Swiss-Prot record:
UniProt keyword terms in alphabetical order: Antibiotic resistance, ATP-binding, Cell inner membrane, Cell membrane, Membrane, Nucleotide-binding, Translocase, Transmembrane, Transmembrane helix, Transport
SUPFAM superfamilies: P-loop containing nucleoside triphosphate hydrolases (SSF52540)
Subunit field text: Homodimer.
Limits of the ABC transporter domain: 9-247
Protein name: Macrolide export ATP-binding/permease protein MacB 1/2
Annotated stretches, region: Disordered: 230-257
GO CC annotation terms, alphabetical: plasma membrane
Known role: Non-canonical ABC transporter that contains transmembrane domains (TMD), which form a pore in the inner membrane, and an ATP-binding domain (NBD), which is responsible for energy generation. Confers resistance against macrolides.
Family (UniProt): Belongs to the ABC transporter superfamily. Macrolide exporter (TC 3.A.1.122) family.
Residues that coordinate or bind ATP: 45-52
InterPro entries: AAA+_ATPase, ABC3_permease_C, ABC_transporter-like_ATP-bd, ABC_transporter-like_CS, MacB-like_ATP-bd, MacB_PCD, Macrolide_Exporter_MacB, P-loop_NTPase
Annotated organism of origin: Paracoccus denitrificans (strain Pd 1222)
Extent of Pro residues compositional bias: 237-255
TM stretches of this protein: 294-314, 541-561, 598-618, 634-654
Amino acid sequence: MAETGAPLIRLRGVGREYPSGEGVLRVLTDIDLDIGQGEFVAVMGASGSGKSTLMNILGCLDRPSSGSYRMDGREVARLGAGELAALRRETFGFIFQRYHLLSEMTALGNVEVPAIYRGLPADARRARARDLLERLGLGDRTGHRPGQLSGGQQQRVSIARALVNDARVILADEPTGALDSRSGDEVLGILERLNAEGRTVVIVTHDPRVAARAHRVVEIADGRIVADRRTGAPAADPGPGPAQAPQPAPQPAPVQAPVQARVQARAAVPVLGRLAEALRMALLSMRAHKLRSFLTMLGIIIGIASVVSVVALGEGSRRQVLQNIAGLGTNTLQIFPGRDFGDMRSGRVTTLVTADAAALARQPHVASVSPTVGTSATLRHGATEASAQISGVGEQYFDVAGVALTQGRGFDEADVAAMGQNVVIDENTRTSLFGDGPALGQVFMAGKVPLRVIGVAEAQNRGPGGSTSLTVYAPYTTVQARYLGSTSVSGLTLRVADDVDMALAEQMVADILTRRHGTRDFFIVNNDQIRQTITSTTQTLALLIAAIAVISLVVGGIGVMNIMLVSVTERIGEIGLRMAVGARRGDIRAQFLIEAVLVCVIGGIAGILAALGFGLAFERMSSDFTLVYSPLSMLAALASACAIGLAFGYLPAVNAAKLDPVKALQKG
């Protein structure tokens, strides 16, 4: 607590020095100064005398290298960064020679900034800021940006900003230095009225005429106080006038509350509310630098679009491959004569016969079996001729191989037993022979054998570009007797029961046929193994391409970090101003971190839209292949964008939060 009768501000033996080469530069030496509540003090000195450094120490923007500074009885040197921010936010109001207004914000928005960090509700602080501007004669300029205001108007905006938190102490650094004489007199008149209301006003100036308006002048030269005198200036009449400052509005902390209580008191500032304000300010910054923001997020757009498109491409490829393999049947084994594909002696192997199919069909692990034989023939219908593959199969083949019928029916056991001439043709054959006309019931010649159409099956093995081969499915007995003149078959297609392991079933089939033939003169193709191998290969390729796309995403993140680091340098003055009006280091860090995340999220959304656009264009160019987009991959892409914003925005945000407010204001 403050000592009874103690001054509001007390400095004893305060010195400030900076490293300079191998030595130090002493700017202030043994400063002893007391300033009471309600005083109007001018600190006057030539350029380089140390007066601005003294003001920075008074306003807790800088720390003394030596000595003691007590504010309302509390030692300032013992305050942490957060407590100093609270002191600047709740006790001091700063007026700068160069105004330090944020160019992307309106006059009203600039005045609101300190109240944002104090945690006032949006409606309350907006009403407070508007009232201040109206009382300072800027009621019709609340929506103007700094570039649309004169110097005097900008300085009045900065005065309103200093008052929005009902500051007890006004610190003005050369407040009239950049103004004409009339505007300067208006500003000094406002400061006099503020002092008349009971506020402590400290002006830093080099102009004796400005200093003469104060009640007390402290002269400083070469870092030392050389004079401290009263001027005898009369107190200002706080009567009505266009430049009259507003009466203090009720605030969370009373005007006369001691600093210790004000620093320790913490307003109930909802975290979400502060984050919402940081988000709003980030949007304002992005809108003020549209091209830079777009170029920053361009790398993210490309990276996210690449990742989403590659995932969609991989899923589309996987489904296309599985669709093609589905033509081979589900849970199927195919048995062929010979040692393997390309066996020169396979044509002389005649031991694979229909009796093998019957033997396998009796096994409990086998759902169905169909012998297969094949030949080719020329089809004729009217004046139309076409070459086709004649596939001799059993009545169960369509179920075994998963061939779907689009019209009619398949042949039955009676057709197989009677070597009947009822056949099923595929869609390609139907189109080739009959065009758009009816196919069911039509008779055509296959070589010298007349065949009647009883069903139409979907075309098989449709990959990119489609298949143009013609296929006729006939009873295998018909093909053996009427085309081949042999009882052997070219293969067996077997469907395994759903609850049986494919590898075990393959081994059991091999054992049965080996016993029947006396040797292993056949080989087995496990379609599920092919499916798994191709699916695994497709996924591996998709992961490889996705890894390349992720690299582009990381490069985009590095670009975000680079631009944000540049942004910190460009906006160093803004950072200093925000700290001066009470922003915590966490507030600065959150603002830049949210800005980085926002850039990445907007870039991520744009990247997803770009990927969807690419998919539509791709479908127009290739109707046989479709990119399959996954909502999960899109959510993962947005999550990745957020993570990249957090990861690559952290360093710039930390750098911004570590800035010294004095150095930031000087460089800005």
